[in-house]
Amino acid sequence: GLGARIRSQVSIPGVGRVDLIIGERLVIEADGREWHEGGSAFHADRIRDLALLRLGYVVIRVSYPLIMSEWMLVELTVRALIGRREHLWSATHRREGLAR
């Protein structure tokens, strides 16, 4: 395992549902062509990413081909973020009222 709690389809106020949250603040969004390919959907996804970043979340957006063909790269990235404890709220986040 990753050594961190994984939750799926988590609702974040002001953003909506995200695909996964690892730990407290690492968001993984999986983009399939069916829902995320059109120009307006692509734009809406980036608006969501910016909202998540303003709230203090770390966002990784991965495509279906990345998940299916390059999973090791995705996992290495997630493990690196966990190793740096970026999946957890810091004391600074808590002081600034970002921790949820």
Model-inferred region functions:
Residues G1-R100:
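Surface segments flanking catalytic/ligand-binding clefts of nucleic-acid enzymes
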